[in-house]
């Protein structure tokens, strides 16, 4: 009787493990049945009348579907080749599972401006260009568009709050230059409780993001929204 119980227990464990492995394999192989899709592009006859952004955002269902194409590689080359080493597989998985607020928390933990990077980073040479399923001929995961979708949704849902340091310090820090590096530095220093003043020769903060990138690629309101968040957090520009 004892031997039978042991056998029965091991058999059940084997079946459960096998089922779990099968489920995981199906989840990791979705790229074989779901084709790569990019967000829709505004028609040229409409684009010719303005300088607005030319790509739409993913719909919720489409973003989850495209995020589910990530195979969760053992060695995530997308992350390796990202200059910020963003935790890309993690927030893709969370997006696929409709855990979008958590996806935003992971995305923003290594990136001060994910919605901007999602729009202007050369993903074809970095994360997407080194996606393993791209190398196997299935088409890369649309990482940049999903990154943009996550943070734009976070703004719409009110998940992005002004910085409230746990401690306010008496020391002041001056940041020279209001470009993306200066804005990111100011944000991190403000989180530590320092009083921050950013100095720039131009009348608007953003640097290259404002003065060097056209609206059809990055609308100015996206950058202004970020600088306003810093000002609301106590950063002086």
Feature roles, as predicted:
Residues 172-196:
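N-terminal Rossmann-like FAD-binding beta1-loop-alpha1 element of flavoenzymes
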Residues 112, 179-180, 204:
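Residue-level detector of alpha-helix initiation sites
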Residues 19, 23-172:
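Ferredoxin-type iron-sulfur electron-transfer modules and their immediate structural context
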Residues 194-210:
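Glycine-rich FAD pyrophosphate-binding loop
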Residues 104-111, 146, 209-237:
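N-terminal Rossmann-like dinucleotide/flavin-binding domain of flavoprotein oxidoreductases
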């Amino acid at each position: 009787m004892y031997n039978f119980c042991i056998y029965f227990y091991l058999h059940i464990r084997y079946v459960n493990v096998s089922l779990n492995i099968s489920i995981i394999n199906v989840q990791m192989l979705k790229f074989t049945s779901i084709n790569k899709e990019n967000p829709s592009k505004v028609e040229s006859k409409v684009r010719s009348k303005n300088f607005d952004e030319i790509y739409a955002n993913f719909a919720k269902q489409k973003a989850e579907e495209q995020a589910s194409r990530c195979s969760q590689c053992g060695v995530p080359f997308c992350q390796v080749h990202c200059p910020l080493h963003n935790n890309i597989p993690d927030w893709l998985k969370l997006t696929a599972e409709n855990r979008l607020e958590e996806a935003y928390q992971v995305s923003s933990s290594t990136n001060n401006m994910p919605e901007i990077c999602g729009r202007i980073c050369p993903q074809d040479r970095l994360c997407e260009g080194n996606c393993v399923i791209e190398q196997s001929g299935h088409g890369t995961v649309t990482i940049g568009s999903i990154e943009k979708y996550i943070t734009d949704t976070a703004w719409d849902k009110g998940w992005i709050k002004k910085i409230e340091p746990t401690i306010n310090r008496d020391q002041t820090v001056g940041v020279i230059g209001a470009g993306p590096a200066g804005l990111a530095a100011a944000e991190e220093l403000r989180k530590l409780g320092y009083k921050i003043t950013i100095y720039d020769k131009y009348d608007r903060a953003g640097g290259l993001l404002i003065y060097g990138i056209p609206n059809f690629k990055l609308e100015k309101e996206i950058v202004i929204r970020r600088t306003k968040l810093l000002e609301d957090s106590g950063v002086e520009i």
